[in-house]
């Protein structure tokens, strides 16, 4: 039978509940326990798929095609465990389900209320994750802040959960903030006390407090917090600001978080194996030479809009003993100032996914610059479509070529709507979503990077390469290096004569992990490193490798 951990947050929003939940998942897994983590989001949207990236950040796509909160990306990257649509729950999806049941007569004419019907549906979703995942421990992060009216049904549901399982089968963790007041030179505990008081008024007594702070929390302060909040001093867990989110599991391990959780859950505290994770963090803190990577997008004002892309680049740099010098480049600014100005000195260019017309010409200009300057380039989803548009306009002489998404009446729709999308009206949850196979062409750059004939990647798109232009595309020197098994849908393109120029219709960033970077991102960073000046000893090593025919085998033509 599964055990359950609930993570709430107080004092301020964006306090790091998702990282705490993901870190606990990592620590439990290091002790041999299987884990599943779900997010309860208090907004009324059914899912974040139609929400603006400026408001919500990126949409993380699961294997089964759910459009979810970006925290699920943290869960997957930290635990190396695939989540599903069951792991993402919103207020909108709960109300939709309850109303649909009411319309079907499932409540036998009863009055449908927040309690017990909404809270009961929430509890059912948590139980469903436990039964479908067969996890030893199910961790649930409750979005929002204690005191928000939107979160009340979720908090009531996790209070009621005590009646579903034994008290020894669940633990409540409350993440809070200890602000430092410079004039008094003190960390203040009063906001934490009031946050816990609010939680208690709902009927939840936290078992552990994770206290965020920018400086050390001494034993006297922990004793004070524990006394006022009704938790043992040992269960007051400091969480100091970290230089990397990947350092947080190690910090929380040192502070005893997992040990205390296991004690509350009456589970054995097995030996923990965090050696590989510690080595990863050591490499993060002691990186090699920096590679300058330009991320050209339309949502660059909010970095979270491209969170998984950035993490995938970090993973690749870790594997290549490089440090990431990331440059955020607004695609619209390229339209105003030119690619030569904004991309000068870059070692690689990434054009990620997106929707809509704004900034597309800037992305196309960035891709042209990377192609002509022979700078390593990786395009993702819309980035691949922009690479096709760039080819059509600048190499195929189709100067008005574009995507049918951007200009439905274009005479040269080199990107057009997927046939199965022709009659789709609703926007939410209706794209080509989730994992699909891609057959990789033998002898291609992609084949050398993947080392596999068939790969499975996550998708999120409505538009595709228009096969009416396939022959012209191939005659121009480009290669279609990956396609759907039936050969109809173009999944990967590349330019063989270029040091590294590849783009994919899918989102490889969702499959990258700290200790297992995605091959396309690792290939990009490896190619970017070839542009760096190297020390005499490194130059000699490369010369020897070249003489032996073994320099960078994954990128050899």
Swiss-Prot record:
Annotated segments matching region Disordered: 532-557
Pfam families: CTP_synth_N, GATase
Enzyme class: ligase
Keyword S-adenosyl-L-methionine: no
Biological processes annotated in GO: 'de novo' CTP biosynthetic process; pyrimidine nucleobase biosynthetic process
Protein name in the entry: CTP synthase
Gene that this polypeptide is encoded by: pyrG
Binding residues annotated for L-glutamine, in chain numbering: 354, 382-385, 405, 462
Glutamine amidotransferase type-1 domain mapped to chain residues: 292-534
């Amino acid at each position: 039978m599964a055990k359950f951990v609930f993570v709430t947050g107080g004092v301020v929003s964006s306090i790091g509940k998702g990282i705490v939940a993901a870190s606990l998942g990592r620590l439990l897994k290091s002790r041999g326990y299987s884990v599943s983590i779900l997010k309860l989001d208090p907004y009324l949207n059914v899912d974040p798929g139609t929400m603006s990236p400026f408001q919500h950040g990126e949409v993380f796509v699961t294997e089964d095609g759910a459009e979810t909160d970006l925290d699920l990306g943290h869960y997957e990257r930290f635990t190396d465990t695939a989540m599903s649509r069951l792991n993402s729950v919103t207020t909108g999806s709960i109300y939709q389900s309850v109303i649909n049941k009411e319309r079907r007569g499932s409540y036998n004419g009863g009055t449908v209320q927040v309690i017990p019907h909404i809270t009961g549906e929430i509890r059912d979703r948590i139980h469903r994750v436990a039964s479908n995942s067969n996890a030893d421990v199910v961790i649930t992060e409750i979005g929002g802040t204690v005191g928000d009216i939107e979160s009340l049904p979720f908090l009531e549901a996790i209070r009621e959960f005590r009646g579903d399982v034994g008290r020894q089968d669940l633990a409540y963790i409350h993440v809070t903030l200890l602000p430092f007041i410079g004039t008094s030179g003190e960390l203040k505990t009063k906001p934490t006390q009031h946050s816990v008081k609010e939680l208690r008024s709902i009927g939840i007594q936290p078992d552990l407090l994770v206290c965020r702070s920018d400086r050390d929390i001494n034993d006297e302060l922990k004793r004070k917090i524990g006394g006022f909040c009704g938790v043992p001093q040992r269960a007051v867990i400091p969480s100091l600001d970290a230089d990397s989110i990947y350092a947080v599991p190690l910090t929380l391990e040192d502070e005893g978080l997992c040990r205390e959780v296991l004690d509350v859950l009456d589970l054995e505290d097995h030996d923990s194996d965090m050696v590989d994770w510690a080595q990863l963090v050591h490499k993060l803190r002691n990186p090699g030479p920096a590679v300058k990577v330009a991320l050209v997008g339309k949502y660059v004002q909010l970095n979270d809009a491209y969170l998984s892309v950035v993490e995938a680049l970090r993973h690749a740099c870790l594997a290549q003993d490089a440090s990431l010098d990331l440059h955020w480049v607004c695609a619209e600014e390229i339209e105003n100032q030119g690619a030569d100005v904004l991309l000068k000195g870059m070692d690689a260019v990434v054009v990620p996914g997106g929707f809509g017309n704004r900034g597309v010409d800037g992305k196309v200009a960035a891709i042209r610059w990377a192609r002509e300057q022979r700078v390593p380039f990786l395009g993702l989803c819309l980035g691949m479509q922009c690479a096709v548009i760039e080819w059509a306009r600048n190499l195929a002489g189709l100067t008005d070529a574009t995507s049918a998404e951007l200009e439905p009446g274009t005479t040269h729709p080199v990107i057009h709507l997927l046939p199965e999308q022709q009659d789709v009206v609703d926007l939410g949850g209706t794209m080509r979503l989730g994992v699909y196979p891609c057959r990789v062409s033998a002898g291609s750059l992609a084949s050398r990077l993947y080392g596999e004939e068939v790969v499975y990647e996550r998708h999120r798109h409505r538009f595709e390469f228009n096969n009416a232009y396939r022959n012209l595309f191939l005659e121009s020197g480009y290669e279609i290096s990956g396609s759907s098994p039936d050969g109809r849908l173009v999944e990967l393109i590349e330019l063989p004569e270029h040091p590294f120029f590849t783009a994919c219709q899918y989102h490889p960033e969702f499959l990258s992990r700290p200790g297992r970077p995605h091959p396309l991102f690792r290939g990009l960073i490896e190619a970017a490193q070839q542009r760096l000046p190297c020390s005499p000893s490194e130059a000699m090593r490369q010369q020897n490798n070249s003489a032996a025919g073994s320099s960078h085998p994954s990128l050899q033509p």
